[in-house]
């Protein structure tokens, strides 16, 4: 078929091809970084999982395009099915190439504040985090009233927005509103890899580039707020953000302490293989088996002695450049945290399959459990995003509206400002 470069036309074509089961043709539209992270097989699994719930496609709606940002246009295409619907969300560049593709709930599922958020108890304002061409937008949430509140900077994993939007859920917005309701000022921001996605696959890019400059800038922005105690600004990281948090604190001595939510410690290539195998076991079949085998091959290359700065990013896990993986080899989050003279709160979900008690938390415990200023707690019913549930955790669970467990918000708030 003739390739159109108009983002809306591209989005419609992709939905039509997907609905027709022509997944290999959709993969041909993927940018190298997307192709490294997904495949025709993974698209087939995701699509068939959704259609099993919603029934066959009955109609494809009009694409809705957002204003261009960092050279990409985000397009949402509503799809009506026999027993419901879904939204196909894509990021398209000006040549018609796909840089992002996900299946989301119908757009009519708005985020609702959790019961523990009390909007009349805080204010919010927009900020710019960082300077120069890689500056990003953010939000600072400050409790009302007179006080020198503790502050908390939130760090997400992956190319996330400031709310860590996942389906209809916004776990970082849950945290910001819930904590601000309890007397904690919070700064959150769009990741540089979200606003400037081209950075994530650029040669030379590392975890330091992904996290440290903007995290340090956010810490200093919070310290400048007149209602915030500059000596009590902490950093919270979830998943990869939890892994990176000790590195941020090492770079910025004024950080008062760390909160790690499901911070991973197992070498990431091995974790990626574990997750791929878990997903293949949840939904056995040729496509999931092929996806797990592909991840295993990429992980083996990442961990091999043959990995070099010139190894193409498209051959590596997540489409990250070799520089990222070579830098990770020299970074030990537990040892870095242990060298910090700062208090820490480590929380882990018992149902988390992405970061686990057995493979990840055990390393934090071995390195830090004997320290009196370190608190470690497992929320047995929580998944990776700290949503409560029962039974095995699955990616599909993130597409149902949920909120961060109120017990997690209480743990963090009480640790930052112990009840008197």
Indicate where each model-derived feature is located.
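Short solvent-exposed beta->alpha transition segments
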Residues: 9, 24-70
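N-terminal cap/lid segment of alpha/beta-hydrolase-fold proteins
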Residues: 108-146
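Cap/lid segment of the alpha/beta-hydrolase catalytic domain
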Residues: 154-210, 387-398
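Alpha/beta-hydrolase active-site loop
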Residues: 204-225
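Accessory cap/linker subdomain of secreted extracellular hydrolases
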Residues: 251, 257-339
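Short beta-strand/loop motif that positions the catalytic acidic residue
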Residues: 340, 346-348
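Conserved alpha/beta-hydrolase "acid-adjacent" motif
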Residues: 353-360
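Catalytic active-site module of serine/aspartate enzymes centered on a nucleophile-bearing elbow/loop
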Residues: 382-386, 390-420
């Amino acid at each position: 078929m003739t390739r159109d470069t108009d983002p809306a036309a591209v989005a419609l074509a992709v939905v039509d091809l997907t609905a027709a089961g022509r997944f290999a043709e959709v993969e041909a539209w993927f940018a190298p970084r997307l192709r490294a992270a997904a495949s025709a097989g993974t698209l087939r699994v995701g699509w068939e999982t959704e259609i099993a719930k919603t029934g066959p496609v009955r109609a494809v709606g009009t694409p809705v395009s957002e204003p261009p940002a960092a050279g990409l246009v985000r397009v949402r295409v509503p799809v009506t099915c026999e027993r419901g619907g879904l939204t196909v969300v894509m990021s398209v560049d000006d040549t018609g190439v796909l840089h992002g593709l996900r299946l989301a709930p119908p757009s009519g599922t708005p985020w609702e504040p959790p019961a523990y958020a009390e909007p009349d108890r805080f204010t919010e304002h927009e900020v710019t985090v960082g300077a120069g061409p890689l500056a990003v937008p953010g939000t600072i949430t400050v409790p009302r009233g007179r006080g020198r509140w503790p502050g908390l900077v939130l760090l997400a994993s992956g190319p996330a927005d400031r709310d860590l939007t996942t389906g209809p859920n916004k776990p970082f917005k849950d945290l910001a509103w819930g904590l601000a309701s309890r007397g904690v000022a919070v700064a959150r921001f769009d990741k540089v890899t979200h606003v400037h996605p081209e950075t994530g696959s650029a040669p030379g890019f590392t975890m330091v580039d992904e996290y440290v400059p903007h995290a340090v800038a956010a810490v200093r922005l919070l310290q400048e707020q007149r209602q915030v105690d500059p000596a009590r600004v902490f950093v919270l990281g979830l998943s990869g953000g939890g892994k990176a948090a000790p590195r941020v604190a090492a770079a910025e001595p004024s950080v008062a302490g760390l909160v790690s939510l499901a911070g991973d410690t197992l070498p990431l290539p091995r974790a990626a293989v574990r997750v791929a195998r878990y997903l293949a076991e949840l939904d056995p079949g040729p496509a999931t088996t092929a996806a797990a085998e592909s991840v295993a091959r990429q992980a083996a290359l990442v961990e091999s002695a043959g990995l070099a700065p010139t190894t193409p990013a498209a051959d590596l896990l997540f489409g990250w450049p070799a520089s990222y993986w070579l830098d990770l080899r020299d970074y030990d989050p537990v040892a870095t945290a242990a060298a910090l003279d700062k208090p820490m709160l480590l929380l882990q979900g018992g149902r988390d399959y992405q970061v686990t008690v057995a493979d990840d938390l055990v390393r934090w415990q071995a390195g830090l459990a004997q320290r009196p200023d370190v608190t470690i707690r497992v929320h047995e019913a929580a998944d990776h995003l700290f949503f409560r549930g029962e039974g095995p955790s699955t990616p599909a669970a993130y597409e149902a509206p949920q909120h961060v467990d109120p017990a997690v918000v209480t743990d963090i708030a009480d640790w930052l400002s112990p009840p008197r």
